C-alpha cells in the first residue's frame, strides 16, 4: 500500500471539486405552452380561486379533520415519505468514512515440555473513505433527496384527493337524505291522492282506472324510496372506508345539502398555478431524480479513488500495542472504465428513463391545464343551469296546482294530476342535484388549483 503525502491528499480534494462540477447536468424545465387566457402572476399573489372556509360548514370541517387523521391511504403516504428520508440518510451513512477494528488473543504451550504458556495479541483499526472526485456521491445524495421531495408531494396529493373524496361523501349523504325527505313527502301526497280517488270512485265521480293509477303512483314512489335507502347504506359504508374502520359506525350524516351561499370563484388563472399542484411537483422532482441518476451512471466511467488508513500492531502483550502502535495511510484506485461497454449501456438506460419522465411530465402539465379549464367551464354551466331549473320548478308547481283543481272539478282524469306531481318532484330533485354537483365542482376546482397549506 502506497503512503500518501498530505500535499497529495489536498490536491486530490481540489481536483474533486473541479471534476464534480464538470459532470453535473443542469436541470432545465421543459418548454410548455399555456392557454392564452392564463396570466403571468406575481409570486406573492394569491393563486387560490376561493377560501375553503367560505363553505361555512363546521360539520364538514370536523369530518375532514377526522378523515385526515385516520385514513389508511394517507398513513401509507406518510410511511413512504419516512422511507424516502431513511433512504436519503442511508446514502450519507454509506459514504461516511468507514471504521473497522479487530482484536485477537492467543496462547501457545508445548505439550512435551514444562515451558510456560506463550501469549500473543494482534490488534488493528482500519478506516477508508472514498474521495468524491467526480461528484458521484453528491449526485447519489441529490437523487435520494429529489425522491424524498417527490414522496412529500405524493403525500400532499393523497391528502388533497382525500379532501375531495371525503367532501363528496359528506355532500352525497346530504343529497341522498334530502331526496329521501322529498320522496317521503311525495309518498304521503300520493297516498292522499289515492284516498281522494277512492272517495270519488265510491261516490261515482271517477272510474276505477283513476284508483289503479293512484295505486301505481304510491308503489312507484315506495320503490324509489327503497332504492335510495340502499344508496344511503353504500355511502355510509364508503365513509367507513375513508375512516379506515369497519362498516356500521357512522361518524357524520348531514340531513340535507347546505343551501347557503356558495364560495365565489375567481375566473382568473395564474400561470404559476401548476407549480403548486402536488402531482405536478412530484412529477418534476422525479424528472430531476432521473437526471441525477444519469450523472451517477456517467461518473461510473471514471476511476474511484479511496483513502485508507490503519493503526495496529502484533506483540506478545496488549500493553505493548498500546505503547507502540504502528500507523499507515494509503490509497486504492479502481478502474471501472475498463468495462466501458457495460457502463455505456447503463448511461443509455438512465438517459432513456430520464427522457421518458420528461415526456410524462409535459403530458401531465397539459392534462392539468385541460382539467382546470374543464372544471371552470363546468362551474359556469352549473350556474346557468341553476337559473333555468329554478324557473322550471316554479312552472312545474304551477302546473301541478292547475291540474289538481281541474281534477277536483272533474275536468280531467287523475293521470294528468299524477303526471304533474311527478314533473314537480323531478324538477325539485334536479335542483338539488344541481346544488350537489356545484359543491363537488367547487371541491374539484380547489383540488385542481393545488389546495393550500391551511385546508382542514
Residue ranges and their predicted role:
Residues 76-91, 158, 162-185, 189-199, ...:
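Amphipathic alpha-helical coiled-coil segments
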Residues 16-18:
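C-terminal motif of bacterial Sec signal peptides marking the signal peptidase cleavage site
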Residues 95-118, 128-157, 179, 281, ...:
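Small/polar (Gly/Ser/Thr/Ala-rich) solvent-exposed segments
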Residues 20-89, 258-287, 336-337, 365:
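Bacterial Sec-pathway N-terminal export signals of envelope proteins
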Residues 64, 122-126, 170, 270, ...:
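Membrane-embedded beta-strand positions in outer-membrane beta-barrel channels/transporters
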Residues 207, 226-274, 413, 440-456:
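Short, solvent-exposed, mixed-charge loop/turn linkers that connect secondary-structure elements
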Residues 1-8:
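Bacterial N-terminal signal peptides that target proteins for export
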Residues 60-62, 120-122, 168, 213, ...:
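Transmembrane beta-barrel architecture of outer-membrane proteins
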